[in-house]
Amino acid sequence: MLKRYVLILVTITSMLFFSGCGEKEELTVFKEQISNFYTEVSAIETEINAIAEDSENAVSTLLINMEQMSEQFQKLADLEVPAEFVSVEDLADDAASYMYEAVRLYGEAYEDDYVSDSLIQAASYNYESAMKRINYIAILLQGEIPEGAPVIEGDGTEFEPYVEE
């Protein structure tokens, strides 16, 4: 899944780079920031996938990497978005909120050497929701509308974290 994001990023970066000689400074900065985001998230995802489940420090390594990923998502949400990509701003905010909630729930799920399956399920839902929005952002930056994505008129956010009840 992450490889698809990296491929989309390369495509977006190329499109933005070759979009004309008169690129605005704001668009250039945004392009670099998006590229850095995907590079960082890809590196973190690689580290997460390399964790040996039977390792003594697997949980702590996972949680550290998830914290780093959440920080990257927050940086994405804090970016100044050019007018050409204004729809990305709400998606980035939602993605950061979902990732923050996923990290919080994963932390609770593994608290005190007790594993809570329901919290892991809730954390996983929030993680997947964050990644879905990152995919939507990549598609929007290509100038397309994500398939199956709701079209929202006006301002607003749809962040509704899944939490254990």
Question: What kind of feature is each model-predicted range?
Answer:
Residues 1-5:
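Positively charged n-region of N-terminal signal peptides that target proteins for export
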Residues 6-7, 136:
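Sequence-pattern detector for short linear motifs
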Residues 7-15:
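Hydrophobic helical h-region of N-terminal Sec-dependent signal peptides
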Residues 16-20:
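C-terminal motif of bacterial Sec signal peptides marking the signal peptidase cleavage site
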Residues 22-25:
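Bacterial signal peptide processing site
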Residues 29-164:
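Alpha-helical segments in soluble extracytoplasmic regions
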